[in-house]
């Protein structure tokens, strides 16, 4: 038998085998499925994460709003307290001013009283000095009076002695001398009396 030759007609370059396209399609579908399988969990995770983040954000926002409200309330309270404290401070300042004024007045009054007391003490000291001087003068006067009394007593004693002597002289003259002699004796007595008076005045 003569050999048979199988002759294949050459295919154009644009034409490919039908199995190749199916493979590519399968690969594309598989890749799409894989991508979908990967993307869906990512989307779910992102949604969950976003939802939790949103919730957390809302919670944080609520907390922030609550804290801001609390802070505003505290601020208003602190402002009210500050206003009350300022009012109390103003009243305290007024009371302090009034107390200072009253204290200054009292201090001035006390100083005036002290000055008066010092003046009175000085006057009392002067009066005491005057009293002491007067007492010394009185003592001197008493001593002088006592001396005068002693002198008077001496003079009285001398006068008594003189009178006794005169009596003796009179009796003696009356007994021994006549009437003329009595007249002469009376003249002598009168002369003696005249002499005794200046002596008394001298003492």
Swiss-Prot record:
Record localization: Golgi apparatus, trans-Golgi network; Cell membrane; Late endosome; Membrane raft
One Gene Ontology term from the biological process aspect of the record: negative regulation of intracellular transport of viral material
Propeptide segment residues: 184-203
Membrane-spanning intervals of the chain: 27-47
GO CC annotation, single: cell surface
Gene3D superfamilies linked to this entry: 1.20.5.1700
Membrane topology, record value: Single-pass type II membrane protein; Lipid-anchor; GPI-anchor
Covalent lipid sites (GPI-anchor amidated serine): 183
Molecular function per GO: metalloendopeptidase inhibitor activity
All ranges on the Cytoplasmic side of the membrane: 1-26
InterPro entries in the cross-refs: BST2
Extracellular compartment residues: 48-183
Coiled-coil segments on the chain, per record: 66-178
Modifications the protein undergoes after translation, according to the UniProt entry: The GPI anchor is essential for its antiviral activity.
Keywords (A to Z) from UniProt: Cell membrane, Coiled coil, Cytoplasm, Disulfide bond, Endosome, Glycoprotein, Golgi apparatus, GPI-anchor, Immunity, Innate immunity, Lipoprotein, Membrane, Signal-anchor, Transmembrane, Transmembrane helix
Annotated glycan sites: 66, 93
Pfam families: BST2 (PF16716)
Function: IFN-induced antiviral host restriction factor which efficiently blocks the release of diverse mammalian enveloped viruses by directly tethering nascent virions to the membranes of infected cells. Acts as a direct physical tether, holding virions to the cell membrane and linking virions to each other. The tethered virions can be internalized by endocytosis and subsequently degraded or they can remain on the cell surface. In either case, their spread as cell-free virions is restricted.
Domain notes: The extracellular coiled coil domain forms an extended 170 A long semi-flexible rod-like structure important for virion retention at the cell surface and prevention of virus spreading.
Subunit comment: Parallel homodimer; disulfide-linked. May form homotetramers under reducing conditions. Isoform 1 and isoform 2 form homodimers and also heterodimers with each other. Dimerization is essential for its antiviral activity. Interacts (via cytoplasmic domain) with ARHGAP44. Interacts with MMP14 (via C-terminal cytoplasmic tail). Interacts with LILRA4/ILT7. Interacts with RNF115.
PANTHER family, A to Z: BONE MARROW STROMAL ANTIGEN 2 (PTHR15190:SF1)
Protein name in UniProt: Bone marrow stromal antigen 2
Gene: Bst2
């Amino acid at each position: 038998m003569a050999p048979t030759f199988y002759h294949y007609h050459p295919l154009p370059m644009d034409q490919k085998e039908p199995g190749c396209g199916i493979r590519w399609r399968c690969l594309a579908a598989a890749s799409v499925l894989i991508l979908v399988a990967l993307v869906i969990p990512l989307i779910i995770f992102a949604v969950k994460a976003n939802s939790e983040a949103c919730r957390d954000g809302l919670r944080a926002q609520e907390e922030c709003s609550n804290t801001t409200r609390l802070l505003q309330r505290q601020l208003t309270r602190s402002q009210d307290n500050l206003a009350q404290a300022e009012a109390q401070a103003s009243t305290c300042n007024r009371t302090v001013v009034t107390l200072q004024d009253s204290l200054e007045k009292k201090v001035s009054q006390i100083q005036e009283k002290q000055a008066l007391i010092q003046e009175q003490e000085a006057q009392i000291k002067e009066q005491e000095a005057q009293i002491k001087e007067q007492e010394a003068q009185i003592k001197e006067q008493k001593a002088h009076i006592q001396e005068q009394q002693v002198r008077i007593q001496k003079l009285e004693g001398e006068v008594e002695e003189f009178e006794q002597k005169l009596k003796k002289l009179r009796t003696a003259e009356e007994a021994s001398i006549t009437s003329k002699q009595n007249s002469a004796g009376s003249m002598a007595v009168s002369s003696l009396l005249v002499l005794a008076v200046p002596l008394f005045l001298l003492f």
